[in-house]
């Protein structure tokens, strides 16, 4: 009887210890992970941070302008300003899902299968594969959006539209068994950050989940974070770069080889693959960043046994 009781006690202790190990985060055995000896370099058009204020100065006096911010082998992102009364042609992407964030102004969005809606500051909009859509700028001020798609994504147009000229290409009348994509996996046509933030418990959520791209709303307050640890260099991603659009407040970015960057609303921060970074909310008020990369479950590789 004594031996049986002892065995049961030891088994119970083993379960408790295992639970404590899992909570401490030390239950995962360390792995050898490759990392280049030299810190990856930034290749144009990429910069550690693209300031919205600088873009506005660069394009001052223009009602319509665009500038590519991200153009790597995973994603393509660009800022687009459009004047009131202008609109895109009706179009669709044959194999990719597109999304954009409205930074300023008002956009009337028409998406096949959805009721038209108006997107404003804080709005995030996405259009699934093979789904026809158009964007119209309304109101009395230009609208500014940050638009993202898969690298080298192609654009098709319905027959009633006149496609733009593309050097080296011709336009053919084609069919592709087009089927508008679904809003599955929790994807939605439109959300607005400020509507979401009316819930005091809101601290972010994935906005766009696709096989080859991912956009995550990360929202909160610096006061809710653990104390800043300058020795914690965060994590890196071994398969692709990552970028963020600051949607509200300020975000602090220690980036390997670049020092500390404080990014504000409208700024875009970019970190190449294999580069350590440790973003966190900064300042007294609420802050939000939209994290964008090419993998729905991207690996966050950190130094073993250090909190991230």
Language-model segment annotations:
Residues 22-76, 89-90, 155-227, 233, ...:
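A short, N-terminal "cap"/entry segment at the start of jelly-roll beta-barrel domains
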Residues 123, 129-156, 273-300:
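Ligand-binding loop in jelly-roll beta-barrel domains
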Residues 78, 98, 115, 123, ...:
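Short, conserved secondary-structure segments in the cores of folded domains
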Residues 6-16:
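Bacterial N-terminal signal peptides
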Residues 1-2:
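N-terminal secretory signal peptides that target proteins for export/translocation
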Residues 113-129, 257-273:
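Short acidic-glycine-tyrosine-enriched beta hairpin
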Residues 81-83, 93-109, 222-224, 236-253:
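Short, conserved beta-strand element in jelly-roll/cupin
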Residues 66-69, 79, 88-94, 111, ...:
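Short histidine-centered beta-strand/loop micro-motifs
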């Amino acid at each position: 009887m004594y031996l049986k009781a002892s065995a049961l006690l030891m088994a119970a202790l083993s379960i408790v210890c295992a639970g404590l190990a899992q909570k401490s985060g030390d239950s995962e055995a360390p792995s050898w992970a490759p990392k280049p000896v030299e810190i990856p370099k930034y290749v144009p058009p990429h910069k550690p941070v693209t300031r919205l204020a600088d873009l506005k100065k660069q394009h001052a006096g223009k009602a319509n302008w665009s500038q590519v911010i991200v153009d790597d082998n995973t994603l393509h992102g660009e800022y687009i300003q459009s004047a009131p009364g202008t609109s895109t042609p009706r179009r669709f992407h044959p194999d990719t899902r597109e999304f954009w964030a409205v930074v300023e102004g008002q956009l009337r969005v028409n998406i096949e299968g959805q009721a038209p809606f108006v997107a404003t500051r804080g709005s995030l909009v996405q259009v699934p594969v093979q789904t026809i859509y158009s964007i119209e700028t309304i109101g009395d001020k230009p609208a500014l959006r940050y638009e993202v798609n898969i690298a080298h994504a192609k654009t098709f147009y319905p027959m009633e539209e006149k496609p733009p000229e593309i050097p080296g290409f011709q336009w053919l009348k084609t069919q592709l068994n087009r089927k508008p994509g679904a809003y599955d996996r929790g994807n939605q046509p439109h959300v607005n950050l400020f509507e979401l933030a009316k819930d005091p418990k809101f601290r972010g959520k994935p906005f766009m989940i696709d096989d080859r791209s991912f956009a995550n709303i990360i929202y909160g307050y610096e006061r809710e974070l653990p104390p800043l640890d300058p020795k914690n260099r965060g994590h890196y991603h071994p398969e692709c770069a990552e970028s963020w659009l600051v949607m509200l407040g300020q975000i602090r970015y220690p980036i390997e080889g670049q020092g500390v960057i404080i990014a504000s609303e409208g700024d875009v921060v970019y970190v190449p693959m294999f580069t350590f970074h440790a973003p966190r909310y900064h300042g007294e008020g609420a802050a939000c960043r939209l994290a964008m990369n090419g993998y729905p479950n991207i690996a966050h590789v950190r130094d073993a046994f250090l909190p991230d």
